[in-house]
Structure formats: structure tokens, C-alpha cells
Amino acid sequence: FRSMKSKRLTLFVLFVVAAVANALACTNLIVGKNASADGSTIVSYSADSYGLFGELYHYPAGMHKKGTLIDIHEWDTGKYLGQIEQARQTYNVIGNMNEFQLTIGETTFGGRPELVDTTGIIDYGSLIYLGLQRSRTAREAIKVMTELVQEYGYYSSGESFTIADPNEIWIMEMIGKGPGVRGAVW
């Protein structure tokens, strides 16, 4: 009888651990124009990890000289990844939204570690904020984000980006092509 209780307890503990492990992920709630009462697009983003506390980072709008370089640091660790050319014009960003009501959230789905471009300069967090600084619409953000990883490489595992503006919402999944291979599959 004790053996059966012990097995049940072990199975219960394993189930709880598995459930908790799966809960450590990001969550996006997405509502399109045709699904909201007033025709708004709605996106909520929560980082279900212990390390993110909802800081509202501010990137002011600006005009930049041609050839200006900016440092890129990995979002999660702060590790220096390299430099990229700054856009001539950038837009005001607070948190995960810019002055044109463009918003970008993410959900990590991981993937095979050998697909991370370990020589890449752009990680998922930098990609979000560069997209917001350089884009007015969701479609433009998709173009900017994919061009950046094509030029500089994608230094992250699999991500699902939620990209929304007042008119439409897109979900773009992205995963690298491997070490030293620029671009991403999206």
C-alpha cells in the first residue's frame, strides 16, 4: 500500500513540476479590429518569468547622421554583441509601443540550440526595440526586423513576435539558420 502511495505522490510531484516549468513563458493576448467592441486592436504582453518587472524603457525620437553606429547588447544578459548602423530617423518609444501606436511583444518558443547564429549581432530584445524605433506600421516593422537579421544575423532561439498597429496585428515566428549564417527563417 505504501508503494502505491509513493508512486502516486511521485507522479503528482512530477505533474506539478511539469506544469510549473511550462508556466515560465511569456503570454500575449491578441484581439483584432473585428473582434473588439470598438474596432480597436488590442495586445497585452506579460513576461511570466521572475526577472522582468515591466520597466518602461524610453528611446527618444531623433535624427541621426549617416554612418552613426550604435552598440547592441543582448537583451537578457547585457552581453555586447557588436555595432550596427543607426537609422537616419528614429521614433519615440516607451515600453513596447512607439508614438504611432505600433506595439511589439514576444513569446519565446526556444527551438534547436544549433540554429542560433552565435556570430549574429541582433537578439530578439534588440530586434523589438529597433523595430519600434524604425517603423510606423506593423508591416513596416516586419520588413525592418527581417532586413536587420538578414544583414546582421539573428542571435536568439525561436521567438514568436506579436506586431500590431491601430489597423492590424501580425504574428511572426523567427528562428536562426545556425552559426555564421545570416538571416532567419520566418
What are these regions, as identified by a protein language model?
Residues V116-D117, S126-S135:
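Second-shell loop/turn segments in exported
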Residues L9-L14, S160:
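Intrinsically disordered and other compositionally biased segments
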Residues F1-L11:
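Bacterial N-terminal signal peptides that target proteins for export
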